[in-house]
Amino acid sequence: MSASLVGSEMCIRDRMITIRVEGDEWEPSIDRTPGVVREIGASPEEIIAKIREAGIVGMGGAGYPTPIKTAVPADKKVDCLIVNGIECEPYLTADDRLMVEKAEQIIVGAKILNKALGIQNAIIAVDENKPAAIEVLRKITRSYVGVNVQVMKTKYPQGAEKQLIEAVTGREVPSGKLPADVGCIVQNVGTVNAVYEAVQKNKPLFERVVTVSGDAAETPSNFMVRIGTPASFLISKVHGNPAEIGKIIFGGPMMGTSAVNINAPITKLSSGILLFKDDISFKPEETVCIRCGKCVEACPVGLMPFAIASQVRDGDYHEMKKLHVLDCIECGSCAYICPARIPLLDYCKLGKYELKKSK
């Protein structure tokens, strides 16, 4: 566990640690000279060590430790790094802003990861609805061999790891397998930028860009904030009135989680805070499944959510496994489109939980 500032522990309450600030140990160690450091002097082993020491994890939502993801097993042959700049959930623009303002750092970060992986090819995948980011990335990549920009159709959930690999390379990750099994590694743009800062500037991961938006945010904005910053601080910065806020969501409206505490802290995985005037979690009355198949059509993984829901109700773990419930990426498309208003995503989550627990 690491903190974004130096101080002494005051108390632990509600799964949060309160720290009394006593200085900033990071300042002297960070190279704060202006300009991008293009020359990569670190060896592959040194790169992975620096990533580990900096506490870098996947910042797109999964939070998987980056040094583990970068240290590919000897029996896996990786030939492509995909930098994930797909930000397909409504309201969120943190990655977009980062690509516009830190484009060259991201490109050098991709080159650093290429060196650590022992490969030559990196593709930065960006939604077609991000023209400013596309323009600046394309302009700068002309000076870098082995890094290319690929513009993707804007659709949800294009940014999911396995779906992005198939869209970019045409390779399909089999059920139960990992991206490395088809020769790919996917890293979020925020993670790649953090890799650059760790390796080239000796900067640990103690801050990130966070979108604060929604109809209860008077001035929606993106902020670079320290990990551990209370949500209430950012809410005040967008002139949000706590008395008018009916729902706070950490992340996006499709895959985010509700926050019950206005002082909940920003974490390494907090891409956004959404503020809504009404409680948008209102659930219409559930009716009987009519076997329309819309959930099957909407599922990007090709699952049958209606059948999974039925087996979860029956507690049939064997059938759940046969229906590949563990492949569910929890995008929520099935529940969103269901005309019977069945909480299919909840059933899929419960099925995954029960199946893992039964092992």
Residue ranges of model-derived segments:
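Single conserved hydrophobic/aromatic residue that forms the stacking wall/gate
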Residues: 2-7, 12
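Fe-S ferredoxin-like electron-transfer domains
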Residues: 13-66
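Short, ordered loop/turn segments at secondary-structure junctions
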Residues: 24-26, 86, 96, 126-129, ...
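Short acidic, glycine/serine/threonine-rich loops at helix termini
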Residues: 30-33, 62-63, 69-70, 92-96, ...
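Conserved mixed alpha/beta catalytic, RNA-binding, or beta-rich assembly cores of soluble enzyme
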Residues: 40, 44, 51-64, 74-106, ...
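Polyanionic/metal-chelating signatures
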Residues: 110
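Hydrophobic alpha-helical positions that pack around
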Residues: 119-231, 237-242, 252
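Ferredoxin-type iron-sulfur electron-transfer modules in oxidoreductases and energy-metabolism complexes
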Residues: 270-283, 296, 300-359
